[in-house]
């Protein structure tokens, strides 16, 4: 059985737990997998525990093996993920992550699992290689297919009867692996939130996937005779089809309320009054500039989901800035800044009311584009109390969503400096506390 891309959406967790428990009551041997992105700090209890509550819940599910997604590998600071699995009752498998000391101590590159009947299953796992972001977080992420081919040369793996890939790589890479690496027998996929309700077959390799947010739970039945596969059945079961129990809503609410309670115990500051949404956006940009030592900033007001409270706690700040994003800094000339502004502002009206998803954004809509350190109007830039020569370099700070999302080609084509480890709300918190 398998789940993936829960992203701290615990709404279906009670159903998944019952499904796992009920389908484990069998004479057949059962393995339970999590294929990554279980953790997402947009949930207050995940945020306050740095993901450790997710591991506790995975333990309660009886997970046997797991791998990581980008929300663990990038969404968590290196120090956080190095602590994440200390109390895990399951093994983490990951074959394409290193640091200067070598492989992470909390993961194995592969596992050879021998069934009661003596059939040897090779379990391998890889996460999507976001090179630009793993590096600043202190990791070296390797090409997944090259790593897979190298691991397949290991005598233990080569001698296995059946090879299963736990893939947080996305559907396109899964299909590519199925075509190029015939040694893999089964790929359990994730990352792109795709669903294979009855599985797929590509070049003789079986593919399974179970969506996102717990909207499906995966079940794969494997039959072996003399250590060779004789039958396979793949299913992704919609959790909406599973029975609810009256305690489910209270359980999910308790997780959220407990997170908010723990965050609320930490007062950040007392403001003279409750600021407006625009004033909050201005404050966020000041924090960004201070943290990044930048001259200029651009954000969208939709980053501030709700205005800051006057007596601002970490719970309030989490509600206002729930996003899983950091800062990116560029060095630009006046001409380059004009190009960037034209690119962003020409799309501003179109994006304003769009419900944005992904790339770390956890708000409702994009909102208006605002600036700090300069104004842009009618294709012209006016700097705040500063004369800028045409060839002078200035530093511009943005949220990294602008860098990774497909909207702004003027940014994606440039080399930016990604700033780790703090998330946006951590940057704002430090600014308000006077710690920058």
Where do the PLM segments sit?
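Structural motif
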Residues: 167-168, 301, 398-401
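A generic structural motif
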Residues: 33-36, 189-191, 299-302, 355, ...
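A short C-terminal boundary segment appended to hydrolase-like catalytic domains
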Residues: 225-313, 317-320, 432-436
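Acidic, metal/ion-coordinating pockets
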Residues: 1-239, 277-282, 287
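Structured segments of extracytoplasmic/periplasmic soluble domains
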Residues: 19-22, 154, 286-291, 340-347, ...
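A short, polar/proline- and glycine-enriched secondary-structure boundary/capping micro-motif
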Residues: 132-136, 219, 241-249, 308-309, ...
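Feature captures C-terminal
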Residues: 10-12, 308-436
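Hydrophobic beta-strand segments of well-ordered beta-sheets in folded domains
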Residues: 66, 296, 394-396
